[in-house]
Amino acid sequence: MSEKAYELAHIDELDRFPVDDEGLLWRPVRRRLGITAFGTNAYTAEKGDERVVEEHHEQDGAEELYFVASGRATFTLGDEEIDAPAGTFIYAEPGTKRGAIASEPKTTVVAFGARPGVPHEISAWEEIFVAFGHLRNGNEEEGRKAMAAAIAAKPDAWQGQFNAACFEALTKNSDAAIEHLRRAIELDPRAAEYAQKDTDFDWLRDDPEFPV
């Protein structure tokens, strides 16, 4: 019997990872379907009048296409504002500032992106976003597994260790938080500068073992 030749998922079946405390949800599509040629994710604003696409530029030449799957959004493209009801496609040229605010509750925007002529590189830090998404959903152990996978993918990068320290600080696991932060600083002293400003560590600063 041949291997399965397709993957199928309804948008309602996608993971729902909170991005913040305001109701914005990250709905991984590429990860769910195993796509490697381009990036694609969905974002849902549970409330109206909140950001559903962060304001940003694509400076590396990546092309991005957005599709409003449900609800309604107001896109900012350069200096223009565009009303985009459900069913609207929006393509932004590389370098164009873009972002979107949900005009209605439950607005979902699906984003697709890749750099022309360049093999798509899956972000090594995607699992970090998954880890914090699980944590915000109250699933600490699944979050810890995702964080471990991110570190294993890039063991010599300070960012993974730093984010693991933040994760453990948020779960009030002081020993693990300090251990990861020490390792991050060993890999790159910049981690100490970031730790000085990161409020995740505020409750740990009086600990004599805290390395900053």
Named regions from a protein language model:
Residues 1-56:
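A short, N-terminal "cap"/entry segment at the start of jelly-roll beta-barrel domains
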Residues 58-75:
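Short, conserved beta-strand element in jelly-roll/cupin
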Residues 79-94:
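Short acidic-glycine-tyrosine-enriched beta hairpin
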Residues 104-120:
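A short hydrophobic beta-strand segment most commonly corresponding to one strand
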Residues 124, 158-159, 192-193:
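Helix-start (N-cap) detector for alpha-helical repeat units in TPR-like alpha-solenoids
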